[in-house]
């Protein structure tokens, strides 16, 4: 209560443009939503998926696949992580996203976690989803982030799932809570109808999937997108589904897209013995080539040595698609990162220069706190929201995945607000980009198949 009062006072005396994290009482309240919804997510998700699969007449471990057109040869797709602020830090990427999506090789787009800030609500979808995506003509799929779950995923379902799956999911969620819900069935149907109206008005090809997770399978490549909810967990139905999809992808190049990353800010975030650690250990043992996730709002890369034919599990943290920048990585990178090969964007020098130039006087005590004692006793990352700059230069990014059976390779390329991001834009260590032209675009090229798979 006291925190909300303080936030209210600060809001009343500060001029706020766009989305602001520390000076937005709804965002403060979302902390309460997280505490309430977190433990319920697995039950909700399992009920939703079970009901939809039953309605479709499919076993749950054989449902929820999507099939974009044009994947019978070489193709590309975009992955945009944590986009949904609806302010300049999201909009600055719009022209580059549209330019890349306009390439005929790009067949679909995936939004990866936190589609709508601060609390995943329907009222924010037009500003934070449809307007920024206007002009995008390729199919759009998504996995939710923790913020999308704060309203029990109702708005995500209405906008990203097929209308039938959305209504079934929303009813199933209410059912598992014994009917304790703020929405009547008529209101659910009205929300779904409004989502259909907005998709039509803005020309967005969404509402194509039937669950908050899905897979895309071609003869050579598999994308398996999973939802790790609020607390980095998956229910039994989703876990069994993922295992079945991994089994179906044996012998293929497998990329897993998740809501939360294993490595972030130069640290292994998976505590040993936890379900979350078990998820990533499973990917390593199963021969997955690439793990990608968002949640932290920047770009990071880690090469994890693993046993098996590939020898490396490549981790991409791809969360720079629109939310405020996570400053902890560049300003508090550890001396001993968890993998020998690593990279992150923006560089420490570039971010420090912006902080020195753009930090207003009343925030200088926070900047001094970071520079002198690394924000002790909290972390630098804890203070990221204070530095939610809505002015250039921005350090947002997204990724393109180019799947080329004709060349036997998969290429991961990094894009920013002005086009290709270059090796000179990153801080990096180990073999990451070793010997690369500093002015060349950041790309990681991997073989589609390796001996022994």
What positions do the PLM features span?
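Active-site-adjacent structural elements in enzyme catalytic domains
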Residues: 115-132
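Metal-dependent phosphoesterase/phosphodiesterase active-site architecture
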Residues: 1-102, 107-110, 148, 158-254, ...
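Short, conserved loop/helix-junction motifs that constitute active-site signature segments
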Residues: 133-137, 283-284, 307-310
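Charged, well-ordered internal alpha-helical segments
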Residues: 278-286
């Amino acid at each position: 209560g006291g925190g909300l009062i303080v936030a209210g006072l600060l809001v009343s005396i500060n001029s706020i443009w766009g989305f602001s994290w520390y000076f937005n009482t709804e965002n403060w309240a979302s902390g309460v939503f997280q505490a309430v919804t977190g433990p319920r997510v697995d039950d909700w998700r399992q009920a939703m998926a079970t009901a939809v699969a039953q309605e479709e007449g499919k076993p749950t471990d054989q449902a929820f696949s999507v099939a974009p057109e044009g994947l019978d040869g070489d193709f590309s797709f975009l992955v945009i992580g944590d986009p949904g602020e609806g302010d300049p830090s999201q909009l600055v990427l719009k022209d580059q996203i549209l330019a890349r999506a306009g390439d005929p090789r790009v067949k679909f787009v995936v939004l990866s976690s936190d589609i709508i800030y601060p609390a995943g609500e329907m009222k924010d979808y037009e500003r934070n989803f449809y307007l920024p995506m206007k002009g995008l003509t390729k199919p759009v799929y998504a996995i939710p982030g923790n913020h999308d779950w704060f309203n029990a995923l109702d708005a995500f379902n209405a906008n990203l799932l097929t209308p039938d799956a959305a209504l079934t999911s929303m009813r199933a969620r209410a059912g598992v809570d014994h009917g304790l819900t703020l929405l009547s069935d008529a209101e659910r149907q009205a929300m779904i109808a409004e989502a259909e109206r907005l998709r039509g008005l803005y020309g967005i090809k969404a509402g194509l999937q039937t669950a908050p997770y899905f897979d895309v399978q071609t003869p050579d490549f598999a994308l398996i997108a999973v939802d790790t909810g609020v607390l980095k967990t998956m229910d039994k139905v989703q876990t069994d589904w993922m295992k079945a999809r991994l089994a179906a992808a044996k012998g293929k190049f497998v990329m897993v897209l998740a809501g939360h990353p294993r490595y972030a800010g130069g640290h292994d975030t998976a505590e040993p013995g936890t379900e979350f650690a078990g998820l990533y250990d499973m990917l390593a043992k199963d021969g997955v080539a690439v793990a990608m996730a968002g949640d932290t709002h920047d770009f990071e890369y880690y090469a994890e040595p693993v046993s098996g034919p590939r020898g490396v599990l490549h981790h991409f943290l791809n969360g720079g698609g629109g939310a405020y920048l996570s400053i902890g990585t560049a300003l508090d990178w550890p001396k001993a990162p968890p993998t020998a090969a690593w990279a992150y964007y923006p560089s420490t020098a570039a971010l420090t220069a912006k902080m020195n130039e753009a930090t207003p006087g009343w925030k200088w005590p926070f900047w001094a706190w970071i520079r002198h004692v690394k924000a002790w006793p909290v972390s630098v990352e804890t203070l990221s929201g204070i530095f939610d700059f809505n002015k250039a230069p921005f350090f947002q990014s997204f990724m393109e995945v180019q799947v080329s059976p004709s060349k036997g390779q998969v290429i991961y390329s990094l894009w920013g607000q002005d086009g290709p991001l270059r090796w000179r834009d990153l801080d990096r260590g180990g073999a990451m980009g070793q010997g690369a032209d500093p002015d060349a675009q950041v790309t990681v090229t991997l073989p589609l198949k390796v001996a022994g798979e």
